Protein backbone atom coordinates (compact mmCIF):
# COMPACT_ATOMS: atom_id res chain seq x y z
CA UNK A 1 0.00 0.00 0.00
CA UNK A 2 1.41 3.36 -1.05
CA UNK A 3 0.79 6.66 0.67
CA UNK A 4 -0.13 9.64 -1.51
CA UNK A 5 -0.36 13.22 -0.28
CA UNK A 6 -2.58 15.72 -2.09
CA UNK A 7 -1.80 19.37 -1.36
CA UNK A 8 -4.19 22.17 -2.27
CA UNK A 9 -2.88 25.74 -2.26
CA UNK A 10 -4.47 29.10 -1.52
CA UNK A 11 -8.13 29.83 -2.17
CA UNK A 12 -8.98 26.26 -3.12
CA UNK A 13 -11.09 26.11 0.04
CA UNK A 14 -13.47 28.37 -1.91
CA UNK A 15 -14.13 25.81 -4.64
CA UNK A 16 -17.80 25.56 -5.49
CA UNK A 17 -18.37 29.27 -4.96
CA UNK A 18 -15.26 31.00 -6.35
CA UNK A 19 -15.49 31.74 -10.07
CA UNK A 20 -17.37 28.53 -10.94
CA UNK A 21 -17.09 29.37 -14.64
CA UNK A 22 -13.33 28.80 -14.27
CA UNK A 23 -13.04 26.32 -11.40
CA UNK A 24 -16.34 24.44 -11.56
CA UNK A 25 -19.12 23.85 -9.04
CA UNK A 26 -17.56 21.01 -7.05
CA UNK A 27 -16.31 21.72 -3.56
CA UNK A 28 -12.90 20.73 -2.25
CA UNK A 29 -14.62 18.24 0.07
CA UNK A 30 -16.25 16.61 -2.97
CA UNK A 31 -12.89 16.29 -4.71
CA UNK A 32 -11.10 14.98 -1.62
CA UNK A 33 -13.83 12.41 -0.96
CA UNK A 34 -13.67 11.07 -4.50
CA UNK A 35 -9.85 10.91 -4.48
CA UNK A 36 -9.79 9.18 -1.10
CA UNK A 37 -12.29 6.56 -2.28
CA UNK A 38 -10.39 5.98 -5.52
CA UNK A 39 -7.13 5.51 -3.62
CA UNK A 40 -8.76 3.19 -1.09
CA UNK A 41 -10.26 1.04 -3.84
CA UNK A 42 -6.81 0.78 -5.43
CA UNK A 43 -5.32 -0.30 -2.10
CA UNK A 44 -3.54 2.97 -1.32
CA UNK A 45 -3.76 5.55 1.45
CA UNK A 46 -4.53 9.18 0.56
CA UNK A 47 -3.82 12.20 2.75
CA UNK A 48 -4.96 15.75 1.96
CA UNK A 49 -4.23 19.27 3.13
CA UNK A 50 -5.47 22.64 1.93
CA UNK A 51 -3.78 25.76 3.18
CA UNK A 52 -3.69 29.42 2.32
CA UNK A 53 -0.36 29.67 4.17
CA UNK A 54 2.83 28.80 2.33
CA UNK A 55 4.65 27.71 5.49
CA UNK A 56 1.92 25.15 6.33
CA UNK A 57 2.31 23.52 2.92
CA UNK A 58 6.10 23.49 3.37
CA UNK A 59 5.82 21.97 6.85
CA UNK A 60 3.47 19.29 5.50
CA UNK A 61 5.93 18.42 2.72
CA UNK A 62 8.67 18.02 5.35
CA UNK A 63 6.39 15.79 7.44
CA UNK A 64 5.61 13.71 4.36
CA UNK A 65 9.27 12.72 4.14
CA UNK A 66 9.29 11.59 7.78
CA UNK A 67 6.06 9.62 7.23
CA UNK A 68 7.37 7.82 4.18
CA UNK A 69 4.87 9.30 1.74
CA UNK A 70 5.47 7.77 -1.68
CA UNK A 71 4.03 10.43 -3.96
CA UNK A 72 2.68 14.00 -3.85
CA UNK A 73 0.02 15.61 -6.00
CA UNK A 74 0.11 19.38 -5.59
CA UNK A 75 -2.08 22.17 -6.86
CA UNK A 76 0.04 25.11 -5.74
CA UNK A 77 -2.65 27.52 -7.03
CA UNK A 78 -1.31 31.10 -6.88
CA UNK A 79 1.95 29.84 -5.33
CA UNK A 80 2.69 28.25 -8.72
CA UNK A 81 3.95 31.58 -9.98
CA UNK A 82 5.68 32.85 -6.84
CA UNK A 83 7.00 30.17 -4.51
CA UNK A 84 10.64 29.23 -4.71
CA UNK A 85 10.26 28.05 -1.09
CA UNK A 86 7.66 25.40 -1.99
CA UNK A 87 9.78 24.28 -4.93
CA UNK A 88 12.81 23.96 -2.65
CA UNK A 89 10.79 21.96 -0.10
CA UNK A 90 9.67 19.50 -2.77
CA UNK A 91 13.21 19.15 -4.10
CA UNK A 92 14.55 18.87 -0.57
CA UNK A 93 12.44 15.84 0.36
CA UNK A 94 12.91 14.09 -2.97
CA UNK A 95 9.35 12.73 -3.13
CA UNK A 96 8.14 12.54 -6.74
CA UNK A 97 5.23 14.86 -7.47
CA UNK A 98 2.72 15.88 -10.10
CA UNK A 99 1.69 19.52 -10.50
CA UNK A 100 -2.05 19.84 -11.02
CA UNK A 101 -4.39 22.71 -11.89
CA UNK A 102 -8.13 22.85 -12.40
CA UNK A 103 -7.94 25.46 -15.14
CA UNK A 104 -5.66 25.60 -18.15
CA UNK A 105 -3.16 28.10 -16.77
CA UNK A 106 -1.65 28.55 -20.24
CA UNK A 107 -4.95 29.86 -21.60
CA UNK A 108 -5.26 32.49 -18.89
CA UNK A 109 -3.45 35.69 -17.93
CA UNK A 110 0.22 35.88 -18.95
CA UNK A 111 1.43 35.97 -15.34
CA UNK A 112 -0.07 32.49 -14.83
CA UNK A 113 2.01 30.94 -17.62
CA UNK A 114 5.18 30.57 -15.52
CA UNK A 115 5.49 27.77 -12.97
CA UNK A 116 8.24 27.25 -10.42
CA UNK A 117 7.31 23.55 -10.30
CA UNK A 118 6.76 22.16 -13.78
CA UNK A 119 10.41 21.67 -14.69
CA UNK A 120 11.03 19.49 -11.62
CA UNK A 121 7.65 17.69 -11.52
CA UNK A 122 7.12 14.17 -12.83
CA UNK A 123 4.37 15.75 -14.92
CA UNK A 124 1.81 18.53 -15.12
CA UNK A 125 -1.94 18.10 -15.58
CA UNK A 126 -4.15 21.14 -16.09
CA UNK A 127 -7.36 22.30 -17.65
CA UNK A 128 -9.68 19.39 -16.89
CA UNK A 129 -11.44 20.85 -13.85
CA UNK A 130 -11.69 18.47 -10.93
CA UNK A 131 -10.83 15.62 -13.30
CA UNK A 132 -7.26 17.00 -13.31
CA UNK A 133 -6.86 15.55 -9.81
CA UNK A 134 -8.25 12.17 -10.87
CA UNK A 135 -5.90 12.03 -13.85
CA UNK A 136 -2.99 12.94 -11.58
CA UNK A 137 -3.98 10.21 -9.14
CA UNK A 138 -4.10 7.62 -11.93
CA UNK A 139 -0.67 8.77 -13.11
CA UNK A 140 0.65 8.52 -9.55
CA UNK A 141 -0.66 4.94 -9.30
CA UNK A 142 1.17 4.11 -12.54
CA UNK A 143 4.43 5.64 -11.33
CA UNK A 144 4.19 3.88 -7.96
CA UNK A 145 3.47 0.46 -9.45
CA UNK A 146 5.73 0.90 -12.47
CA UNK A 147 2.88 0.04 -14.84
Curated annotation (Swiss-Prot):
- Site positions (Transition state stabilizer) are 18
- By its UniProt entry, which SUPFAM superfamilies does this protein fall under? Type II 3-dehydroquinate dehydratase (SSF52304)
Keywords noted in UniProt: Amino-acid biosynthesis, Aromatic amino acid biosynthesis, Lyase
Molecular function via GO:
3-dehydroquinate dehydratase activity
Q: Which Pfam families match?
A: DHquinase_II
Q: Where does substrate bind?
A: 75, 81, 88, 102-103, 112
Provide one Gene Ontology biological process annotation.
chorismate biosynthetic process
User: Which parts of the chain are coiled coil?
Assistant: none
Which InterPro entries does the entry mention?
DHquinase_II, DHquinase_II_CS, DHquinase_II_sf
State the active site: 23, 101
Name the Enzyme Commission number(s) assigned to this protein.
Answer: 4.2.1.10
> NCBIfam families under this entry?
aroQ (TIGR01088), PRK05395.1-1 (NF003804), PRK05395.1-2 (NF003805), PRK05395.1-3 (NF003806), PRK05395.1-4 (NF003807)
Which protein family is it in? Belongs to the type-II 3-dehydroquinase family.
Name it: 3-dehydroquinate dehydratase
Name its species. Answer: Hahella chejuensis (strain KCTC 2396)
Source species taxonomy? Bacteria, Pseudomonadati, Pseudomonadota, Gammaproteobacteria, Oceanospirillales
Gene symbol here is aroQ
